[in-house]
């Protein structure tokens, strides 16, 4: 069976299972009448249309006794700020219930009735933001797989914080004075930095470097005309990024195109081979504009690079 068929079958199984759980939860539950809901117009987040903003006074008095009530309140009356652009529908709530239990659903519903609109209520209840919950739902259900592109799940040194490290320009270019100095050292790049500094760079949760040169072989690589300084590094030097504990490199700089299109594509190929995510340049505009996401400690952090 192909991978695509397995994903489709898995998605169908999840859908059927969610529907079965919904039937069990709804059995003997009190239904909220149309009169109780009132004539307030509420547009579903799934429709893709603009969501009507509701004041607390617009929400009818609903006594939450069971999951049916809780689902109704969240689906009909949760403000768009609380949902933070995520598609919270019946399927998502059934998954949420299966993962975090009845009380978590009801607590969210009570927050809606209390006029809450802070999306952090999801994090406070589960330890995951609504954005991370949505990614977990997509991962588990097989739906919205495009949402998982360029997402990196990172372990942090401490549960209470996320530590990012940012370095300025790095340059491994051939015949450049810093590269020549590095070659003269017994332990190469490691001798160019103190052990304490390298340990600090390797110890952060995410280390980001600005790749201020191109990776390309000398044969066939031609620098662009008219530039006073052009930087080209042997592709094998990409292995040095590991010494810094590099997690991502930025390419939105004035030297990534020093060797034209061929040099740029070679740089992207080398980084892909090393498994180093990059931002700020790409094989096309979409690739160059991509956002890199890190998920740490229940939070989703977006990173972009531009110049």
Describe the function of each predicted region:
Residues 22-36:
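Sec-dependent signal peptide cleavage junction
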Residues 76-79, 94-102, 110-114, 138, ...:
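Sec-exported extracytoplasmic/periplasmic mature domains
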Residues 63, 67-70, 88-92, 104-108, ...:
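Stable alpha-helical elements in mature extracytoplasmic
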Residues 1-14:
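N-terminal Sec-pathway targeting helices
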Residues 43, 49-50, 54-80:
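Zinc-dependent metallopeptidase catalytic helix centered on the HExxH motif
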Residues 67, 82-151:
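Pan-zinc metallopeptidase signature
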Residues 14-20:
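Bacterial N-terminal signal peptides
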Residues 150-307:
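Acidic, metal/ion-coordinating pockets
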């Amino acid at each position: 069976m192909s991978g695509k068929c397995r994903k489709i079958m898995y998605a169908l199984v999840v859908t059927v299972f969610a529907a079965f759980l919904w039937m069990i939860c709804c059995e003997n539950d009190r239904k909220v009448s149309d009169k109780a809901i009132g004539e307030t117009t509420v547009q579903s987040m799934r429709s893709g249309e603009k969501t009507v903003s509701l004041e607390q006074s617009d929400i009818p008095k609903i006594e939450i006794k069971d999951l049916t009530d809780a689902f109704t309140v969240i689906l009909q009356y949760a403000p768009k700020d609380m949902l933070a652009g995520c598609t919270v529908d019946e399927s998502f709530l059934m998954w949420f219930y299966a993962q975090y239990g009845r009380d978590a659903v009801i607590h969210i519903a009570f927050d809606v009735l209390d006029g809450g609109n802070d999306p952090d209520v999801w994090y406070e209840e589960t330890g995951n933001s609504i954005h991370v919950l949505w990614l977990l739902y997509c991962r588990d259900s097989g739906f919205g797989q495009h949402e998982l592109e360029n997402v990196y799940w990172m372990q942090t040194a401490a549960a209470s914080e996320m530590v990012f490290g940012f370095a300025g320009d790095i340059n491994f270019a051939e015949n450049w004075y810093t590269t020549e100095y590095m070659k003269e050292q017994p332990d190469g790049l490691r001798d160019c930095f103190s052990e304490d500094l390298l340990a600090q760079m390797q110890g952060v949760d995410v280390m980001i470097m600005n790749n201020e040169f191109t990776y390309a072989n000398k044969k066939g690589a031609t620098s662009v005309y008219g530039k006073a300084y052009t930087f080209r590094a042997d592709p094998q030097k990409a292995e040095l990024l590991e010494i810094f504990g590099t997690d991502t490199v930025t390419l939105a700089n004035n030297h990534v195109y020093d060797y034209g299109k061929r040099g740029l594509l070679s740089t992207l190929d080398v980084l892909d081979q090393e498994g180093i995510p990059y931002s700020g340049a790409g094989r096309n505009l979409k690739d160059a504009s991509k956002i890199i996401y890190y998920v740490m400690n229940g939070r989703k952090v977006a990173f972009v690079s531009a110049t």
